[in-house]
């Protein structure tokens, strides 16, 4: 989500989110004047907060109350106000060292079973983040690619079909890439191009694990077909990972008691639906946290942040889910994540998840 804010609006949104995260109370201009050096009057802050409310970034839970961040407000906070600072400051490094130290101190890889080790890692992650922690068991035996085919269904629409070694079939409908659809090429030309790209996919991916698809080097595709490569890169990986969930998914879950102390979880029914998701619908949750983001360097962890209604699973649409994959040789093995209220310390949670994923990647290498 891209919203252009002035420097003043950015500072006031940042302060509002920080204050609400710390207090769980609606934020008024007086509190911001007292707690933050914003260099403007209370009246100016009120005016700016009004503008942010009209933009959908803040809202008032009650007419007489202060304002709280919306999901969109948190999204701007994460994408524009804190993510750059995480790259430029030492806070992420400090948290990463804390995670690594705790994992090294408490986990003995030579002596314990893998399940016990990951349970211990999940407990450490929950303690450091104050959230529900989620760690999936590594997927070492997954289906492999038998065949990939692109075909034109109708003008401007194509279908990607994936057949696994066990003859399971998965498909995805897509529009043609803009670079091709705008020129309105002859359908026979499109059919030939799709076959060439299909041949490329099969020559490079047949027999490989579904989890290895994200490592495909699309630059080897002929230059004249690069528009397909740029367009299909995420779609092929997404379809493969959607198809890769094993018959039995196992997720280590820790920290439920800690996060349920938060005021957002005071309603018994909401707590019950979250517990039901964690206990009875692990395959859906596995697919969600194991979804692969696009990576420039497949040996590094990239963190995915889903805020509130961005989560497709209904029980957690009032929560934030932060996740990343751990890898071996660039191939994803499993996932690490934390789940908490939308009012959570995103800086710490993002850094902790990234550090845990990097540590597990090194441990499995």
UniProtKB/Swiss-Prot annotation:
GO MF annotations in UniProt? DNA binding
Q: Which domain of life is it from?
A: Bacteria
Biological processes per GO annotation: negative regulation of DNA-templated transcription
User: Which InterPro entries does the UniProt record give?
Assistant: GAF-like_dom_sf, HrcA, HrcA_C, WH-like_DNA-bd_sf, WH_DNA-bd_sf, WHTH_transcript_rep_HrcA_IDD
Q: Which UniProt keywords apply?
A: Repressor, Stress response, Transcription, Transcription regulation
Q: Which family does it belong to?
A: Belongs to the HrcA family.
- What is the stated purpose of this protein? Negative regulator of class I heat shock genes (grpE-dnaK-dnaJ and groELS operons). Prevents heat-shock induction of these operons.
Mind telling me which NCBIfam families this protein's record contains?
Answer: hrcA
Q: What is this protein called?
A: Heat-inducible transcription repressor HrcA
């Amino acid at each position: 989500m891209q919203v252009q804010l002035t420097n003043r609006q950015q500072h006031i949104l940042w302060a509002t989110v920080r204050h609400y995260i710390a207090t769980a109370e609606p934020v008024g201009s007086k509190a911001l004047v007292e707690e933050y050096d914003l260099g403007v009057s209370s009246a100016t802050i009120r005016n700016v907060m009004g503008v942010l409310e009209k933009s959908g970034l803040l809202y008032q839970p009650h007419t007489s109350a202060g304002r709280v961040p919306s999901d969109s407000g948190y999204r701007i906070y994460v994408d524009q106000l804190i993510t750059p600072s995480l790259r430029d400051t030492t806070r992420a490094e400090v948290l990463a060292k804390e995670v690594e130290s705790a994992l090294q101190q408490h986990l003995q890889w030579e002596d314990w079973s893998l399940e016990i080790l990951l349970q211990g890692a999940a407990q450490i992650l929950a303690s450091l983040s104050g959230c529900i922690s989620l760690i999936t068991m590594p997927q070492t035996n997954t289906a492999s690619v038998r065949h990939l085919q692109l075909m034109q269904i109708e003008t401007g629409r194509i279908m990607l079909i994936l057949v696994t070694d066990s003859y399971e079939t998965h498909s995805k409908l897509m529009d043609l890439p803009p670079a091709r659809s705008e020129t309105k090429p002859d359908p026979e030309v499109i059919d030939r191009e799709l076959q060439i790209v299909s041949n490329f996919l099969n020559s490079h991916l047949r027999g490989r694990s579904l989890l290895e698809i994200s490592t495909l080097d699309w630059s080897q595709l002929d230059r004249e077909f690069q528009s397909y490569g740029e367009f299909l890169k995420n779609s092929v990986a997404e379809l493969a990972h959607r198809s890769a969930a094993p018959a039995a998914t196992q997720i280590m879950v820790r920290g439920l008691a800690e996060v349920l102390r938060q005021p957002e979880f005071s309603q018994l029914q909401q707590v019950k639906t979250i517990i039901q998701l964690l206990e009875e619908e692990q395959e859906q949750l596995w697919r969600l946290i194991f979804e692969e983001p696009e990576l420039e360097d497949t040996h590094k962890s990239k963190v995915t942040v889903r805020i509130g209604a961005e989560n497709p699973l209904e029980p957690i649409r009032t929560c934030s889910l932060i996740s990343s994959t751990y890898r071996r040789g660039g191939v994803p093995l499993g996932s690490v994540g934390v789940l908490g209220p939308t009012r959570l310390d995103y800086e710490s949670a993002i850094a902790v998840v990234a550090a845990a994923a990097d540590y597990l990647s090194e441990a499995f290498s």
